[in-house]
Amino acid sequence: MWSPEREAQAPTGGDPAGLLPPEWEEDEERMSFLFSAFKRSREVNSTDWDSKMGFWAPLVLSHSRRQGVVRLRLRDLQEAFQRKGSVPLGLATVLQDLLRRGELQRESDFMASVDSSWISWGVGVFLLKPLKWTLSNMLGDHKVPAEEVLVAVELLKEKAEEVYRLYQNSPLSSHPVVALSELSALCANSCPDERTFYLVLLQLQKEKRVTVLEQNGEKIVKFARGPHAKVSPVNDVDVGVYQLMQSEQLLSRKVESLSQESERCKEEARRACRAGKKQLALRSLKAKQRTEKRIEALHAKLDTVQGILDRIYASQTDQMVFNAYQAGVGALKLSMKDVTVEKAESLVDQIQELCDTQDEVSQTLAGGVTNGLDFDSEELEKELDILLQDTTTEPLSLLETPQETTLYTNSVPKPRILDAELEAELEKLSLSEGGLIPSSKSPKRQLEPTL
């Protein structure tokens, strides 16, 4: 005989035939009875009624659990439980009974029980209660429409617990504030679709384990600090911490990009040296120095932001976060001296101050740090000398002989040379490269090698 426990041990899969009780294939008489419609009232034959309900109700829920879904519709269940071309005629009655017992809940009713104002209604994530269902209720007809979306209450709670554990075991849990988009990506394998993900968040919100806020067009989620704690409302400190986290990511990406640009400028200067193009090499070195100064300026801001976040991550209570954040914002102002905002006496003023500093960061990232970049010609010459020395260990010509390599090495210029000496050494360097680059006195113009 089939039981929910036995069905739970069956192998998983998308084919319901592998998940159904033994009598599904073995007992034609019983299956014919189970596929027949319920009597209009249980009082007519309570034994038959209870037998059918005891078969279908647990099967509907266990099937949904195995499929990993929390939302179900009558039409989907009818398709899933087809047998030899027939559909169960009593499934609508089963769903009505589960609704009456509170094991199922209409999706629209569930949403009405929780503050769902943050959900993007405009993009069609959820639909309002169908008009057909509303009219049916008014007329006293309690049949479940085939397209009506129902929520399995216990399965939703299980899914919410799964998502909460997933968050707790991820790097996102370093601080309770997280972007909704990041959380959605984390839960992609657990929640099969966007509707399920939003329902899970609403359930966690109902349990007071999360709260959701829209900030500058982007939704952020705040988690409770412990599995048994209640989440506190999103406040200005939470918003400020979230902005700091976004600034850290932005600055880190920009520093990485500028580091790659610096290496590219250095390589261009090295190639120009090998090609005998001193002015081009100097221009590349100047670009490299500009980039390095930008990196240095951004690193200072990044270090400050990371220091604030480190103190916040180490905080265990909202008051400690508050204190760490207040202290951190003051330090951030000192590190960004161009910010001209009067000293704040309240947290709101400090939040505004942080926004001003972030504007400065954005301007820095957009336009670069160019003020005060006076290049020392002697320093550039020194770096050019170093690049010339580097070329001795990385000759480009594949046609060099051992003797040419020796000549190349012996022609390395000494540090701190004058422009005239540098020109002479560059001339020697060009000749040592197998004559690929002629001297300025050569009567014939040759093509430069392709690098």
UniProtKB/Swiss-Prot annotation:
Coiled coil location: 248-312
Main location: cytoplasm
Swiss-Prot/TrEMBL GO biological process terms: autophagosome maturation; autophagy; exit from mitosis; late endosome to lysosome transport; late endosome to vacuole transport; membrane fission; midbody abscission; mitotic metaphase chromosome alignment
Residues modified as Phosphoserine: 232, 411, 432, 442
Keywords, ordered alphabetically: Coiled coil, Cytoplasm, Nucleus, Phosphoprotein, Protein transport, Transport
Region of interest called Disordered, as start-end residue ranges on this chain: 1-22, 431-451
GO CC term, one of those recorded: kinetochore microtubule
Modified residues (Phosphothreonine): 409
InterPro entries in the cross-refs: Snf7_fam
Superkingdom of origin: Eukaryota
Subcellular location: Cytoplasm; Nucleus envelope
Role according to the record: ESCRT-III-like protein required to recruit the ESCRT-III complex to the nuclear envelope (NE) during late anaphase. Together with SPAST, the ESCRT-III complex promotes NE sealing and mitotic spindle disassembly during late anaphase. Recruited to the reforming NE during anaphase by LEMD2. Plays a role in the endosomal sorting pathway.
Complex formation: Interacts with CHMP4B, but not with VPS25. Interacts with LEMD2 (via C-terminus).
Family of the protein in this entry: Belongs to the SNF7 family.
Protein name: Charged multivesicular body protein 7
Species: Mus musculus (Mouse)
